[in-house]
Design a protein with these regions (language model features):
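Structured aminoacyl-transfer and RNA-binding surfaces used for tRNA recognition/handling
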Residues: 1-181, 197-235
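A short alpha-helix capping/helix-loop junction motif
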Residues: 184-185
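Long, charged amphipathic helices and adjacent flexible linkers at domain junctions
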Residues: 190-194
């Protein structure tokens, strides 16, 4: 294993055989198959060499073993569930999303996708804000803004037309505060940031819909059926 320059060396992965019920049934199914039977839960790197960035290697004076385990993957194995979204601490967040949206897990594939997106994104957003990141139009803040807006859009797909993500923060905090105590300390702040961003996005959507309605009426009056590139860009930029 190596990443550009610096310490590197041989690596090994530890897989867990989840059993035939997660397999593809093919005779050659083994570690590395695309099915869900064999799950990588641990990675081990034996750091023995130093790469100077030009593929010249020298032996490290101080060798070490660098290891990393997927905590939620281990939970999937220990709880014998289908995916990380079925792990108890994550499913409790999804249940809160269901309570707020009226959509329940297992009803349909499309609804399940939306529930998973909202669950995943609100977890990520809660931790990001706790670590000091705020929604913005560039860098890390832009990633946070995209996560919140995508989650809000999936809320709309489930019939929610008002801010609701901020109401899930308490559940995210409850499920993680034993390991991350600062979540509870900053909960009020996190909730306020998310609600403010949701309200801002709602105003943006409303304004964009008004502009779209005006454009549509103008095109229909002229008998036009195609939006110009300039109009499309204006809608995108709005």
């Amino acid at each position: 294993w190596e990443h550009g320059s610096g310490p590197c060396g041989p690596c090994s992965e530890i897989y867990y055989d989840r059993g035939e019920k997660y397999g593809c049934g093919k005779p050659g199914c083994t570690v590395g198959c695309d099915c869900d039977r064999y799950m990588e839960v641990w990675n081990v790197v034996f750091s023995q060499f130093d790469n100077d960035g030009h593929d010249h290697y020298t032996e490290l004076k101080q060798k070490n073993i660098d290891t990393g385990m997927g905590l939620e993957r281990l939970a999937v194995v220990c709880q014998d569930v289908d995916s990380l979204f079925d792990v108890d601490t994550v499913m409790n967040i999804t249940n809160k999303v269901s309570q707020l949206t009226g959509a329940f897990y297992g009803q349909s594939l499309k609804r399940d996708v939306s529930l998973r997106v909202i669950t995943d994104h609100i977890r990520a957003a809660t931790f990001m804000i706790c670590d000091g990141i705020l929604p913005s139009n560039e860098g890390r803040g832009y990633v946070l803004r995209r996560l919140l807006r995508r989650a809000a859009r999936h809320g709309k797909l489930l019939g929610v037309n008002e801010p609701f993500l901020y109401r899930i923060v308490d559940t995210v905090v409850h499920e993680n505060e034993c390991q991350y105590g600062d979540l509870r300390e900053k909960q009020t702040y996190i909730t306020k940031v998310i609600r403010t961003e949701e309200e801002s996005f709602a105003r943006t959507i409303d304004g964009g819909m008004r502009i779209f309605a005006e454009m549509l009426a103008e095109h229909q009056a002229k008998g036009e059926t195609v939006f110009s590139g300039a109009d499309a860009f204006k809608l995108y930029d709005t």
